[in-house]
Each structure stands twice: as C-alpha cells, then as structure tokens.
Amino acid sequence: MGKEEKNNIEDKALDNEQEMDQESTSKAVEELSIEEQLERARDTIKELEETCDSFKDEALRARAEMENVRKRAERDVSNARKFGIEKFAKELLPVIDSIEQALKHEVKLEEAIAMKEGIELTSKMLVDTLKKNGLEELDPKGEKFDPNLHEAMAMIPNSEFEDNTIFDVFQKGYMLNGRVVRAAKVVIVKN
C-alpha cells in the first residue's frame, strides 16, 4: 500500500467518523427537539386543563347564583302573597276596635238591642273574613307577657297572679300570617 492510498483510507475513516458524529449530534438535536415538543405539549395541555377547570368553576358559580336568585324570587313572591294585605289589615284594625267599643255599652231599648245584634253579626263577619286572609287576634289575658307580642301599658300588684302575667288587655293585638301587625296593649302583674 502506498502512502497515498494510506492517506485516502485515513481520510475516508476520518470522514466516516465525522459523519457518524454529525449523525449522532443530529439525532441528539432531533431527540432534544422531540423532548422539547413533548414538554411544550404537556404545558399546553396543563394550561388548557386549568382553563377548562376555571370555566367549570365559573359555570358552577353561575348556576348557584341563578338558583339563589330563583329561591329569592320565590321567597319574595311568597312574602308578597302573605303580607300584601298588611297595610289594608292595619287600616281595618281601628274599625274593629270601634265596633268592639260600641258592643261593650249596655243598651236598654228594644230597637237598640236589635241594632247591637246587627253590629255583633257585622263584627263577626269582618273578623271571620280577616281570619280567612291570615289575620289572627291576640287576646292574651292570663298569659305570660311576651315583649314580641305584647306592649306593657301599666303594671299592677296582685298576689293572686305570678309576676309578668297579663292581668288585663287595653287593646287586642293582631298577627298576619305569623307576623305581629300590632302588639296587644296590656296590663301586667308586678309584685
């Protein structure tokens, strides 16, 4: 083998070695770029999952808010139905009081007695009508005093009754569907 041939073989071997180095470097670059691409894809998936979770959370919150609005509207409608006549009921209370005051007076003439019976029937009809619409009378004589239902107008000593017992009622109270429209004005026992 000549020197020239030997140099050619060495050059070819060197070229082959360089090609192999380039191929492995190229493969490493390709593998690195595939790894990078995979990492980027994972990051994108993670971002999309977070966005999806965020939208799910917003949808759940919106649904809950809509449910709360619906319940609030139902409650408002129910209260409007129950307490819509409250002002009307309050305005009728003095009428009931006047009729009851008229009925307390003794009448001696026969015509007046018939008139009193008519007023009694009218009063009963009015009270029955109001009861049908949720108005309840509070006549708490003999009951324990409750500041939520009663208004103390006076206190008297009386050893026959316990303290805070309602001895007398100045003016009846009224409730509309369980809500106090007017507290009963009462005299309570205080020993």
Swiss-Prot record:
<keyword id="KW-0143">Chaperone</keyword>
<comment type="function">
    <text>Participates actively in the response to hyperosmotic and heat shock by preventing the aggregation of stress-denatured proteins, in association with DnaK and GrpE. It is the nucleotide exchange factor for DnaK and may function as a thermosensor. Unfolded proteins bind initially to DnaJ; upon interaction with the DnaJ-bound protein, DnaK hydrolyzes its bound ATP, resulting in the formation of a stable complex. GrpE releases ADP from DnaK; ATP binding to DnaK triggers the release of the substrate protein, thus completing the reaction cycle.</text>
</comment>
<dbReference type="Pfam" id="PF01025">
    <property type="entry name" value="GrpE"/>
</dbReference>
<keyword id="KW-0963">Cytoplasm</keyword>
<dbReference type="GO" id="GO:0042803">
    <property type="term" value="F:protein homodimerization activity"/>
</dbReference>
<dbReference type="GO" id="GO:0051087">
    <property type="term" value="F:protein-folding chaperone binding"/>
</dbReference>
<dbReference type="GO" id="GO:0051082">
    <property type="term" value="F:unfolded protein binding"/>
</dbReference>
<feature type="compositionally biased region" description="Basic and acidic residues">
    <location>
        <begin position="1"/>
        <end position="15"/>
    </location>
</feature>
<dbReference type="InterPro" id="IPR000740">
    <property type="entry name" value="GrpE"/>
</dbReference>
<dbReference type="InterPro" id="IPR013805">
    <property type="entry name" value="GrpE_coiled_coil"/>
</dbReference>
<dbReference type="GO" id="GO:0000774">
    <property type="term" value="F:adenyl-nucleotide exchange factor activity"/>
</dbReference>
<dbReference type="GO" id="GO:0005829">
    <property type="term" value="C:cytosol"/>
</dbReference>
<feature type="region of interest" description="Disordered">
    <location>
        <begin position="1"/>
        <end position="35"/>
    </location>
</feature>
<protein>
    <recommendedName>
        <fullName>Protein GrpE</fullName>
    </recommendedName>
</protein>
<dbReference type="InterPro" id="IPR009012">
    <property type="entry name" value="GrpE_head"/>
</dbReference>
<comment type="subunit">
    <text>Homodimer.</text>
</comment>
<comment type="similarity">
    <text>Belongs to the GrpE family.</text>
</comment>
<keyword id="KW-0346">Stress response</keyword>
<dbReference type="GO" id="GO:0006457">
    <property type="term" value="P:protein folding"/>
</dbReference>
